[in-house]
Every structure is written in C-alpha cells, then in structure tokens.
Amino acid sequence: MSNKPSQLTAGKKLRDADKMSHIPIKVVPSNKSTLLKKPSWMKIKLSSDNTRVNEIKAALRKNNLHSVCEEASCPNLNECFNHGTATFMILGDICTRRCPFCDVGHGKPLAVDANEPKKLAETIKDMKLKYVVITSVDRDDLRDGGAQHFADCIREIRLLNPEIKIEILVPDFKGRMDKALACFEQDLPDVFNHNLETAPHLYKQVRPGADYKWSLKLLQKFKEKHPHIPTKSGLMVGLGETNEDIEQVLTDLRAHDVNMLTLGQYLQPSLDHLAVQRFVPPSEFDELGVKAKALGFDQAACGPLVRSSYHADLQASGQEVK
C-alpha cells in the first residue's frame, strides 16, 4: 500500500514501521541488544497518586480532545498532569508529516472539528488552568496550515478564561507563512513557540518535509509583527549532532530574535524510530544553558527531561527550569 496522502484512508493512523516507510532516508529498525542503556539521570520517579492524572485524562476523553503529552509519549506526562498543566493538541491526532523521531501517528486527517475551540475553552475552564499550551499536528492539507483554527481556539479560550496565559506551539506552515501569520492579527498568544528540533545537516533525516531556514524565518517574521510577544524554540539532543552544532543553532535563533529556549534529550519512542546516538549528561546541559544565556536568551530551560512545554508556565514567568 502506498503512503501517499491521496491514497490513504481518512482517519486511519499509521504508527511505527508503517509510518516510517517511504521517508527520504530509510530508518533501520533498532535491535534491542544494541540500544544504548538509559543512564541513571533519565530515570523518572512516578507519583503513587494518579488522581489528577486520571481527572485530566477523563476531561480529554469526555470532550474528544487530545494532548500531545499522550500522543507523543512524553516522559513527563505524570509530572505535568499532577502539576495541573497539559499541552492540548488541536486539529486531530493524525499528522500529514512522518518525522522519524515523533510518536504521533501519520495519515490522512479527518475534517477539522469546528466545535473544537469551544470544547477546548470549556475543558480548560473546568480544569481551572491558569496557563495552557496549544499545539497541533501538521496539517499540510489545509490552505492556512491550520492557523485560523489556532486563532479561533485562542479567542474562545480567552472568552471563558480571561485571566489565562496562552502559549502556542505551531507547525511550520510551510508554503503559507504570510497567510498563516495574518490569522493571528486579532487573536494573539502570550508566547509564540516553534521548534527547530535539530541541527540543519540532520533535517533530511530527522525532519523530512521541513526546512531549517524557513522555520527560522517564521519565528523572525512573527517577532517583527509582534515585538512585544516572546518567541520560543526547542531542540532535541542525541540524534547525531555535536555540541558545536547546537551552539550554532542557538546563535541562529538569537540572530532571528528568539527569546526563549528549551533543550532536552531525545528518547526513541519505538524500535522503528531513530535510535538515540548519545545520552548527554546533566553537566553538558548546564554548560549549554550558560552559553544560551550568554548569547542573550531571556529564558533557557536545558536538561535531560526538558520538553517544549515542560513547566512552560514557570519558564514564561521567569523561573529557572531544568
């Protein structure tokens, strides 16, 4: 069966090996015996009290909403849910891209749910959240890449939750940047986040379909239009990059006026995904954090378990996050 979007069945989600077929650089499935052993600093303590976790999951199921925490198999799910924060994933749970580092399913998405913005706003109100992160799958099938739906969500959330802070973690809106950015003119977030993910020489393998310079330009153009709103980006380490590669990406981000940074360890979601090439020790994350601050980032959350939205509320308020 071909994996070209036009020949996919709408609503059918491809995972793991099915998702990885026909990407530019073939991913050879890992052998368990050759996997790098997870170091002690990557071990996570799970809370024995899952009451809050179950409450949030129930609220998501009730309103047919998705969290990237679950869809991307984030290691911090329990901690964040118990903290009372969640990153909501809009526009469905099927992505039109098939990045081999990501655990979100690929396929032909269903039509956009026009009621999702209101359902999302009501869920956030019921959960009494003060800070939310809204992200999405890539929707290359939509004329604006889903930007207007983001804006609709921001507007509806603010109507029911006037004191809330909203961070959006957007896709690259490739081929439709101006159209996408125009959608946010009346409904702005408190933080605009778009992840570069990795060094440019790894893009063909790690982010097929994406373009490093395009992503930098997206961050820069939003900042030019809205200089008072912080821009943010994130990177994974352990995919074959060097620390010098990372430092160059940080330099590029600052050259494009990005204010906030997240830097965390890549973890392999399944044997069919890209393998971890190295586990970066906490001391190196600390050093990279120091260099990031020296380059002029207002906030730099650098640590093995840091993810784009990990304690995003604390980072946005200026607190140190590791």
Swiss-Prot record:
<keyword id="KW-0004">4Fe-4S</keyword>
<keyword id="KW-0963">Cytoplasm</keyword>
<dbReference type="GO" id="GO:0005737">
    <property type="term" value="C:cytoplasm"/>
</dbReference>
<dbReference type="Pfam" id="PF16881">
    <property type="entry name" value="LIAS_N"/>
</dbReference>
<comment type="similarity">
    <text>Belongs to the radical SAM superfamily. Lipoyl synthase family.</text>
</comment>
<feature type="binding site">
    <location>
        <position position="80"/>
    </location>
    <ligand>
        <name>[4Fe-4S] cluster 1</name>
    </ligand>
</feature>
<dbReference type="InterPro" id="IPR013785">
    <property type="entry name" value="Aldolase_TIM"/>
</dbReference>
<dbReference type="InterPro" id="IPR006638">
    <property type="entry name" value="Elp3/MiaA/NifB-like_rSAM"/>
</dbReference>
<protein>
    <recommendedName>
        <fullName>Lipoyl synthase</fullName>
        <ecNumber>2.8.1.8</ecNumber>
    </recommendedName>
</protein>
<dbReference type="InterPro" id="IPR007197">
    <property type="entry name" value="rSAM"/>
</dbReference>
<comment type="pathway">
    <text>Protein modification; protein lipoylation via endogenous pathway; protein N(6)-(lipoyl)lysine from octanoyl-[acyl-carrier-protein]: step 2/2.</text>
</comment>
<dbReference type="GO" id="GO:0016992">
    <property type="term" value="F:lipoate synthase activity"/>
</dbReference>
<feature type="binding site">
    <location>
        <position position="95"/>
    </location>
    <ligand>
        <name>[4Fe-4S] cluster 2</name>
    </ligand>
</feature>
<keyword id="KW-0808">Transferase</keyword>
<feature type="binding site">
    <location>
        <position position="69"/>
    </location>
    <ligand>
        <name>[4Fe-4S] cluster 1</name>
    </ligand>
</feature>
<keyword id="KW-0479">Metal-binding</keyword>
<feature type="binding site">
    <location>
        <position position="102"/>
    </location>
    <ligand>
        <name>[4Fe-4S] cluster 2</name>
    </ligand>
</feature>
<dbReference type="InterPro" id="IPR031691">
    <property type="entry name" value="LIAS_N"/>
</dbReference>
<keyword id="KW-0949">S-adenosyl-L-methionine</keyword>
<keyword id="KW-0408">Iron</keyword>
<feature type="binding site">
    <location>
        <position position="99"/>
    </location>
    <ligand>
        <name>[4Fe-4S] cluster 2</name>
    </ligand>
</feature>
<dbReference type="InterPro" id="IPR003698">
    <property type="entry name" value="Lipoyl_synth"/>
</dbReference>
<keyword id="KW-0411">Iron-sulfur</keyword>
<feature type="domain" description="Radical SAM core">
    <location>
        <begin position="81"/>
        <end position="298"/>
    </location>
</feature>
<feature type="binding site">
    <location>
        <position position="309"/>
    </location>
    <ligand>
        <name>[4Fe-4S] cluster 1</name>
    </ligand>
</feature>
<dbReference type="GO" id="GO:0051539">
    <property type="term" value="F:4 iron, 4 sulfur cluster binding"/>
</dbReference>
<dbReference type="Pfam" id="PF04055">
    <property type="entry name" value="Radical_SAM"/>
</dbReference>
<dbReference type="GO" id="GO:0046872">
    <property type="term" value="F:metal ion binding"/>
</dbReference>
<feature type="binding site">
    <location>
        <position position="74"/>
    </location>
    <ligand>
        <name>[4Fe-4S] cluster 1</name>
    </ligand>
</feature>
